[in-house]
């Protein structure tokens, strides 16, 4: 399987390393032609406004949105969640707007408030997973067509809608590939 990782900033190398560790091909996506022949894409963490601006400057935003709308399996982590959200609290700038969620940026606090926790996400695995939150957003509202996958402190931190999964946390910053494996083995995959 060929998995693209949007490669403007964030945990690009970490995502690529985990993809390759599972025996798949990981490719960097920086321009429109990089979207050709990928089976799935990951939108990593980073600074969402910077990534959003780069998507617009490069012209990648339109073709990426079309690919995702046509069913490309997509996983957004942290900033990726913000890019995919239909609405971001206190932010007028819109990006992909492909998931029926409302998100609060930096909702858990600043860089100094970043934290790790452990949790069993029953819809993903019976085993406890380490969840790493770095200036993380969380979801404040979901429409009925969105399936909540995980909450931490009563805050929605993982969800799924059709071919899109989002997480507030960064599984790529751990040695645990459980969440990536779940994404790649989901029923939408070829």
Swiss-Prot record:
**Enzyme Commission designation:** 4.3.3.6, 3.5.1.2
Query: Which reaction does this enzyme catalyse, per its entry?
Result: aldehydo-D-ribose 5-phosphate + D-glyceraldehyde 3-phosphate + L-glutamine = pyridoxal 5'-phosphate + L-glutamate + phosphate + 3 H2O + H(+); L-glutamine + H2O = L-glutamate + NH4(+)
Alphabetically sorted, this entry's keywords are: Glutamine amidotransferase, Hydrolase, Lyase, Pyridoxal phosphate
Give the pathway annotation. Answer: Cofactor biosynthesis; pyridoxal 5'-phosphate biosynthesis
In alphabetical order, the GO MF annotations are: glutaminase activity; pyridoxal 5'-phosphate synthase (glutamine hydrolysing) activity
Establish whether keyword Transferase is in the entry. Answer: no
Q: Does Ribonucleoprotein count among this protein's keywords?
A: no
A single GO BP annotation from the record? pyridoxal phosphate biosynthetic process
Q: Name one GO cellular component term.
A: glutaminase complex
**Which residues carry out catalysis?**
78 (nucleophile), 170 (charge relay system), 172 (charge relay system)
Which residues are noted in the entry as L-glutamine-binding? Answer: 46-48, 105, 134-135
One Pfam assignment: SNO
Residues annotated as signal peptide: none
Functionally, this protein is described as follows: Catalyzes the hydrolysis of glutamine to glutamate and ammonia as part of the biosynthesis of pyridoxal 5'-phosphate. The resulting ammonia molecule is channeled to the active site of PdxS.
The similarity comment for this entry is: Belongs to the glutaminase PdxT/SNO family.
Subunit description: In the presence of PdxS, forms a dodecamer of heterodimers. Only shows activity in the heterodimer.
Q: What is the protein name stated in its UniProt record? A: Pyridoxal 5'-phosphate synthase subunit PdxT
């Amino acid at each position: 399987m060929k998995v693209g990782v949007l490669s403007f900033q964030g945990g690009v190398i970490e995502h690529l390393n985990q993809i390759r560790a599972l025996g798949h091909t990981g490719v960097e996506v920086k321009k429109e032609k990089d979207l050709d022949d990928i089976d799935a894409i990951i939108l990593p963490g980073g600074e969402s406004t910077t990534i959003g601006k780069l998507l617009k400057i490069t012209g990648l935003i339109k073709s990426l949105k079309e690919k995702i709308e046509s069913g490309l399996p997509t996983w957004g982590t942290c900033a990726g969640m913000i890019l995919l959200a239909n609405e971001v609290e206190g932010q007028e700038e819109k990006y992909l707007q492909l998931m029926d969620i409302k998100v609060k940026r930096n909702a858990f606090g600043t860089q100094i408030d970043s934290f790790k926790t452990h949790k069993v996400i029953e819809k993903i695995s019976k085993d406890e997973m380490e969840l790493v939150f770095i200036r993380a957003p969380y979801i404040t509202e979901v429409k009925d067509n969105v399936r909540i996958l995980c909450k931490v402190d009563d805050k929605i931190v993982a969800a799924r809608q059709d071919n899109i999964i989002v997480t507030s946390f960064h599984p790529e910053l751990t040695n645990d590939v459980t969440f990536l494996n779940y994404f790649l083995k989901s029923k939408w995959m070829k």
